[in-house]
Each structure stands twice: as structure tokens, then as C-alpha cells.
């Protein structure tokens, strides 16, 4: 039986490219893709077929529907070989001093539900299936450079990704490394819809002009990464396995320690 991989945020950007890379790297695997919008998921299924790519349109914070998906995977395959937790959101982009209303706190809560609590729930649900893999069950979290350094207006996002980094360490501490491993990867500044939103709406609304200028210049100088670049690293980790030496670690996509998996 081929590997069974679950990818969240699979309808666009890094997630969509990751589905393609995983299937093309391992033609025996089955990928389950989850996202809130269907168009990108449909295009992937048309390209690769329903036997290779199975998708569900849902919000990852909807625990009952995620439970149903995990149960479906259990009944059909009896195992799960890897997860890439890619789904995430950036909003609210706003300074801490301006985040002083009940609505602001609700936005923080929504972001943490998507970027962190839904992932905690998913991992807890999937651990038995990951441990049933004949290989090591690999959990790859898409983190961010904002988890380890401040970005103007990104406090909610950065805090949620920092929590994710710590969660990976906790998994590595609690679970036997011959059964389950976890790693956090910062994908770099990638040419995705999120970057467009930063340049056109979120950044002008919530960042200082100086802070926003970096992202604008990366775009103007064609320095944004193609999604294929981080997707290749994520695919290798979830398919070939997280090295034991990197279990629980946070790394940038181009960290030299990833050499063995960058291929």
C-alpha cells in the first residue's frame, strides 16, 4: 500500500504546489487535500485523478468535520503516513496599541483557531493513525520567520507561529521518534496570494510604510520565491521522512541541515 498524506490549505499557493510535488515524487501515494475553497482542489483532482487526490471542502476549525475525515482515512487505509499543516491566515495586521477592542480580540482568537488550535486538534486526532504507519509518521508544520522575530503589525500571526514551533518541540518530547516526528519549516517569502494581500490591503492598513517597503521591493525586484521551492522541501520531509536530528526543530526552508532531504 502506498503512503497516505494529508495536506491542509491545499487549494492555492504553497499547498496546491505541494500536492503536485508529492504526487509527482511518489506515484503510489494518495493525497487528501483540505481547503475552504473548491476551485483549486477540483483542478488538482482533474489533473491527477480521484484515486490519487481526494479532497474535502471544509474549514479546518470545524472539529466535527475534521473528525469525520480522519475516521474516513482510518476506515479506508488504517493508517496515515504524514501530515503537512499548511493552512493559515495573516489577518489581523495591526499594531498592539490599536488592538484594544473586543472585535480586535475576536480577530486574534479566530487567527489562533486557524493557525494553532485547529492544528493541535488535528494532530491529536491523527496520532493513532500516524503510529499505525509502517514508516515513521511525519508531521510537517508550515511556520514563518515571524515566529522568531517581530514584523510590524504581525503580532497575532507571529505569536501563533511561535506557539506552533513549541508544539513541534512538545511532540518530539512526548512521542517516540521511531513512531512520530515533527518539524517546523519557514518557507521564506513566497509569491502567493498572502503576499499580494500584504502589498495591496493588509500592509497599507496595518503596517508602517517602512515595514511594508521590504515586501514591496521583493515583489518589484522579482525576488519572491516560487511556491515550488518550499514545496520541494516540504514534500521531501513528509515523503522521505524527517531526520531524527531535526525532530522538533524550527528551520528555514534553505537551512543547510535540510541538505539530506532537499535532494
From Swiss-Prot:
The protein's matches in CDD domains, at most eight in alphabetical order, are given as:
SPR-like_SDR_c (cd05367)
This enzyme catalyses: (S)-benzoin + NADP(+) = benzil + NADPH + H(+); 2-hydroxy-1-phenyl-1-propanone + NADP(+) = 1-phenyl-1,2-propanedione + NADPH + H(+)
Instruction: Name the enzyme's class.
Output: oxidoreductase
Active-site residues annotated for this sequence: 143 (proton donor), 157 (proton acceptor), 161 (lowers pka of active site tyr)
EC identifiers of the protein = 1.1.1.320
Its induction note reads: By single-strand DNA damage.
Q: Which SUPFAM superfamilies match?
A: NAD(P)-binding Rossmann-fold domains (SSF51735)
> Which positions are annotated as binding NADP(+)?
7, 86, 157, 161, 190, 192
Q: What does this protein do?
A: Reduces benzil stereospecifically to (S)-benzoin. Also reduces 1-phenyl-1,2-propanedione to 2-hydroxy-1-phenyl-1-propanone. Is probably involved in a pathway contributing to genomic integrity.
What this protein is called in its record is Benzil reductase ((S)-benzoin forming) IRC24
Per the UniProt record, the source organism is Saccharomyces cerevisiae (strain ATCC 204508 / S288c)
